Amino acid sequence: MSASALSSIRFPGSISEYLQVASVLSLLLLLFKTAQLYLHRQWLLSSTQQFPSPPSHWLFGHKILKDQDLQDILTRIKNFPSACPQWLWGSKVRIQVYDPDYMKLILGRSDPKANGSYRFLAPWIGRGLLMLDGQTWFQHRRMLTPAFHYDILKPYTEIMADSVRVMLDKWEQIVGQDSTLEIFRHITLMTLDTIMKCAFSHEGSVQLDRKYKSYIQAVEDLNDLVFSRVRNIFHQNDIIYRVSSNGCKANSACKLAHDHTDQVIKSRRIQLQDEEELEKLKKKRRLDFLDILLFARMENGKSLSDKDLRAEVDTFMFEGHDTTASGISWIFYALATNPEHQQRCRKEIQSLLGDGTSITWNDLDKMPYTTMCIKEALRIYPPVPSVSRELSSPVTFPDGRSLPKGIHVMLSFYGLHHNPTVWPNPEVFDPSRFAPGSSRHSHSFLPFSGGARNCIGKQFAMNELKVAVALTLLRFELLPDPTRVPIPIPRIVLKSKNGIHLHLKKLQ
């Protein structure tokens, strides 16, 4: 066919006509989405009208800097009783709750986790116990509960003590008389060391092996990245987030975290191929966390898939060390800033343990004042600042106000613990609040959440807190650094914007 013949052929429509049609369709789609968002916002405004809040911008919501959330909640508590809406942007709102009666009602229901917040955790920890809902959650919870039976927890006390002593030995070598130490990273390595040995049958010391620092850094990065993504309207879209700089960082951090947990699972599977190891396992009355997962059979008779197995390991690896590290770090800071209570704890521990060469399961219930101080520190600095739920059905609160199905409710444990109508003078460190016989609302103190979905490892965590505090106070006096006062910020766990710096004075 000649060139002249080709040039005479006419195609239906020109490129400009196609562009015009595409522009009209795009405009119609934009108008449709705008109307959809407007109607959704009107529904949200109507649904939350019983709950006053500070003025907000129609598009940008309440203009809150990401590191000022905690200060903002304290202001809201004074002005808006029980609960208050927080608008993140035009059609995104959550009801912040900080009242014990509200907490009791919500935690007593079976509402799922708020998908808008928790789905950003899925690329990291998968759909393990933290993320599951309904019958699947119930099956996994029932399967894992035996890992926290007291027969399992008893021998962990000495393992915890060994890990703490390794950390304290390091501190003796690196602290000077006038120097301060940023303690959070050291404590994080120690709690990872503990969870690896107790729950995952790890041999060796995480604290003395530099390769584990990359996992610690990955967890720290993911804490920040997940929190940042929740607050960014553009990063709600998975495609946009993947190509963003934060999305690339999150992908790299997830890979590091997954490589770590994959290696833990692989190592244990190799160990279990050894007949001697299997014989030792058969003699145990109860299995450890990872062994339960490896030998588990679900109700359909099948073992856990590799995906489900890693999700549970990723979840407990993170929750079992990072939340505990936050708790211990803030407890140490609270004791450093309240020396009279620190000294009273030390005397109690010295009378119980002597020089601390040995600490047993039975000792943990014989330090009442130290336990009171630990609880008071957890009140002021709850390791998990909040959790979120999406209402699966309408709810009416004790004061008569109500919310419809579909609303996101953020249970602010930090707000609850700092609510002056619940805790008079909430900023004052007063361990007597937890004295034996003292009365309080059943849902006024929730460092491990509450209801059926409370922290499955809360007894494990409390034991580790007691061991760490007891052995540390026998070796060091904790003193604050007045030039670097920590600034609490909410991430998945409670962190400090500028670290937690203490003077450590070696005791004679």
From Swiss-Prot:
Its cofactor is heme. Its EC number is 1.14.14.1. GO terms for cellular component: endoplasmic reticulum membrane. The keyword NADP does not apply. Activated by cytochrome b5. The Vmax almost doubles in the presence of cytochrome b5. The gene is Cyp4a12a. Pathway: Lipid metabolism; fatty acid metabolism. Pfam families: p450. Keywords: Endoplasmic reticulum, Heme, Iron, Membrane, Metal-binding, Microsome, Monooxygenase, Oxidoreductase, Signal. GO terms for molecular function: alkane 1-monooxygenase activity; arachidonate omega-hydroxylase activity; heme binding; iron ion binding; monooxygenase activity. It is a peripheral membrane protein. Heme binds at E319, C455. Induction: Up-regulated by 5alpha-dihydrotestosterone. Gender- and strain-specific expression in kidney (at protein level). Predominantly expressed in males, the expression among strains decreasing in the following order: NMRI > FVB/N > 129 Sv/J > Balb/c > C57BL/6. Expressed in renal arterioles. It catalyses: an organic molecule + reduced [NADPH--hemoprotein reductase] + O2 = an alcohol + oxidized [NADPH--hemoprotein reductase] + H2O + H(+); dodecanoate + reduced [NADPH--hemoprotein reductase] + O2 = 11-hydroxydodecanoate + oxidized [NADPH--hemoprotein reductase] + H2O + H(+); dodecanoate + reduced [NADPH--hemoprotein reductase] + O2 = 12-hydroxydodecanoate + oxidized [NADPH--hemoprotein reductase] + H2O + H(+); (5Z,8Z,11Z,14Z)-eicosatetraenoate + reduced [NADPH--hemoprotein reductase] + O2 = 19-hydroxy-(5Z,8Z,11Z,14Z)-eicosatetraenoate + oxidized [NADPH--hemoprotein reductase] + H2O + H(+). This is Cytochrome P450 4A12A. Belongs to the cytochrome P450 family. GO terms for biological process: fatty acid metabolic process; omega-hydroxylase P450 pathway. InterPro entries: Cyt_P450, Cyt_P450_CS, Cyt_P450_E_grp-I, Cyt_P450_sf, Cytochrome_P450_Monoox. Residues 1-37 form the signal peptide. PROSITE patterns: CYTOCHROME_P450 (PS00086). It comes from Mus musculus.
